[in-house]
Amino acid sequence: MGGCCSSSRKSHLVGTPVYYYCPESFEELVPSGTRAGVGSAFTTGLLVDIGLETSIPDTFCAPAPLPYDLLLGRPQCTDSESIKGRMSGSSFETLATCEDLGESDCKTLASSVILSPRKSDFSKHQGLKILVDEEEDCCPICFEDYDVENPRLTTKCEHEFHLSCLLEWIERSDRCPICDKEVVFDDRLN
């Protein structure tokens, strides 16, 4: 089987492209009775530019991307014997079901779990709020901390910026970069 390629020489760029016939094997050089003719030679041979460089490129070729459904992490075991071994260590037989407890106990347990948040969950949320406040102690335009040389300025929409960053921003737009309201700020510095 073969193919074709057009010439990329500068002299041929002006006119019609030139095609070169390159057979894949020596047998294609001799026309047989069934393949005689120019049309059949072009369909079975390979056309290549004479000036084509066939050496291996020195550039790095990136590997093929991973399939989207590939799971990263520890491999999943599909052997039924190993699954049975893991299941035998756990005691699913001893778990209480709703039939064992009675239907009213199950409903009471479910409603009490939903209505009463645990104290540990509440403390986790407070810890996250403290971390967010600490992370937001920088200018949202340049992401640098506030200091004496570049002070903090609070706008009427209660967003904080460096004075220099906000003045530069106002040259391009009169809207707040965070909430898109009109930027109005006090003359006093915070």
UniProtKB/Swiss-Prot annotation:
SMART domains: RING
Reaction(s) this enzyme catalyzes, per UniProt: S-ubiquitinyl-[E2 ubiquitin-conjugating enzyme]-L-cysteine + [acceptor protein]-L-lysine = [E2 ubiquitin-conjugating enzyme]-L-cysteine + N(6)-ubiquitinyl-[acceptor protein]-L-lysine
Domain of life: Eukaryota
Enzyme class: transferase
EC numbers: 2.3.2.27
Keyword annotations from UniProtKB, A to Z: Metal-binding, Transferase, Ubl conjugation pathway, Zinc, Zinc-finger
GO MF terms, alphabetically ordered: transferase activity; zinc ion binding
Zinc fingers (RING-type) by residue: 139-180
Record bears the keyword Transferase: yes
A GO biological process held by the record: protein ubiquitination
Pathway it works in: Protein modification; protein ubiquitination
CDD domains attached to this UniProt entry: RING-H2_AIRP1-like
Pfam families: zf-RING_2
Keyword Zinc: yes
Function in brief: Probable E3 ubiquitin-protein ligase that may possess E3 ubiquitin ligase activity in vitro.
Name of this chain's protein: Probable E3 ubiquitin-protein ligase RHB1A
Organism (species): Arabidopsis thaliana
